[in-house]
Amino acid sequence: MTDLHPLLSRLAAVPGMDAGAPRLVLLFSQLGDFDSLEYAQALVPVLPQLDRVGIQVLAIAIGDGDGADRFCAFTGFPRERLQVEADASLHRALGCSPGLQLPGGPWPALFLMCAGIGSPGTLAEVVRGYTGDRRAPQCFDDEAVVETGVLPAFPAALFQRAGGHRFQRPFELATVRLRNMNEVLRHWRTYVPSDRFITQRGGTFLLAADDSPLYIHRDRGILGFSATMHRPLAFLDPWLQADAAA
């Protein structure tokens, strides 16, 4: 069983995050990691609901203040709910995977992880972004104009022509990831001040008011920030449904 003391000690110093209320703590990996951006983008729309049901939210990522500022401006995640660490000490203390480790350093390891080596589930998740997923919600409103910074802007209604609506259409999630990738690569050193931790994985810790764990997930590989990637916030259903019913 994981010793949560390093996390609880950290939270005790953060106003509103000590014991007494349920807390959702997101250990993002690097600020420039696909998982970090995609997880934040999934969370932003439900933050008001989590506030209403009394769940306090804090994200802790590897990076620095400049990276955190840009990350929040791009994803819409509240800056006051994001803290940064210069290294992966907290992640390691909480049992999060360091990712593939090779004598050649982090870059060869990262490339292999992107190919699914030492990164369970990555290739299947990449493919899902292109093929679509009827279990998942659509990513773009049909009235939206999609801008990736790479392709010419186009109406999101094109996805409806490709596969329908009210579910994740072919190429839709891949387009979200292309936009995220373009943002990170254009500002790499802002998002990733040190390459030492580019393979580090993150985790999710949902704590009860008495500090006992309600839910824990540790990422096993790239694009693995949830056990249910088609609905990454499914673990919050009991609280989100309670808010919807209120």
Located regions from the model:
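A short beta-strand-turn-helix
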Residues: 1-23
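Short acidic-hydrophobic, aromatic-tinged amphipathic segments that line or gate anion-handling sites
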Residues: 8, 80-85
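Short active-site neighborhood of thiol/selenol oxidoreductases, capturing the structured segment around
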Residues: 15-50, 56-57
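Short acidic, S/G/P-rich loop/turn micro-motifs used as interaction or catalytic elements
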Residues: 30-34, 65, 221-222
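Structural microenvironment flanking redox-active thiols in thiol-disulfide oxidoreductases
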Residues: 39-74, 90
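Residues lining hydrophobic/aromatic ligand-binding pockets adjacent to catalytic sites
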Residues: 55, 200-201, 230
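Thiol/selenol-based redox catalytic cores and closely related redox-interacting motifs
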Residues: 85-221
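A short, polar/charged loop-to-alpha-helix boundary motif
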Residues: 220-241
